[in-house]
UniProtKB/Swiss-Prot annotation:
This is 2-C-methyl-D-erythritol 2,4-cyclodiphosphate synthase. 4-CDP-2-C-methyl-D-erythritol 2-phosphate binds at residues 8-10, 34-35, 56-58, 61-65, 100-106, 132-135, 139, 142. Involved in the biosynthesis of isopentenyl diphosphate (IPP) and dimethylallyl diphosphate (DMAPP), two major building blocks of isoprenoid compounds. Catalyzes the conversion of 4-diphosphocytidyl-2-C-methyl-D-erythritol 2-phosphate (CDP-ME2P) to 2-C-methyl-D-erythritol 2,4-cyclodiphosphate (ME-CPP) with a corresponding release of cytidine 5-monophosphate (CMP). Belongs to the IspF family. Its cofactor is a divalent metal cation. Its EC number is 4.6.1.12. The gene is ispF.
Length: 157
């Protein structure tokens, strides 16, 4: 059994939607990023990579590489899962916490879970996503960006 933790942050910038967990969510801002800015999938990818001691997404998908400009984070997550499987592991479960004052995540959580489960090749009950605010404290509370913590439990395949 292996455990990994991931954390990622993206700041808000120009745009009228964000993508989290592969779900496009209307918002008054977009997220600034080299890829599509899916901070949830980035944190989850880091948790998975960490659990098998393969570094982080910056190592595998550097923001200095134009190949990954605007990249679909779901495709990146699927690649990460192929690396996890290549090391002889399968997902036991994953759990993520989105930290954001806005937009409201509750209406989108189920769709996020479904997409993540599909990309990981696991059952829905192996994926949990939840959201919280910081009661208007800190950079997320001031609506300057979004942060996500994720953990992954891997088992021998």
């Amino acid at each position: 059994m292996r455990i990994g933790h991931g954390y990622d942050v993206h700041r808000f910038g120009e745009g009228d939607f964000i993508t989290l967990g592969g779900v496009r969510i209307p918002h008054k801002f977009g997220l600034v990023a080299h890829s599509d800015g899916d901070v949830l999938l980035h944190a989850l990818s880091d948790a998975l990579l960490g659990a098998v001691a393969l570094g982080d997404i910056g190592k595998h998908f550097p923001d200095t590489d134009p190949t990954f400009k605007g990249a679909d984070s779901r495709a990146l997550l699927r690649h990460v899962m192929s690396l996890v499987r290549g090391k002889g592991y399968a997902v036991g479960n994953v759990d993520a916490t989105i930290i954001a004052q806005a937009p409201k995540m509750a209406p989108h959580i189920q769709s996020m879970r479904e997409r993540i489960a599909e990309d990981l090749g696991v059952e829905l009950d192996q994926v949990n996503v939840k959201a919280t605010t910081t009661e208007k404290l800190g950079f997320t509370g001031r609506e300057e960006g979004i942060a996500v913590h994720a953990v992954a439990l891997l088992v021998k395949a």
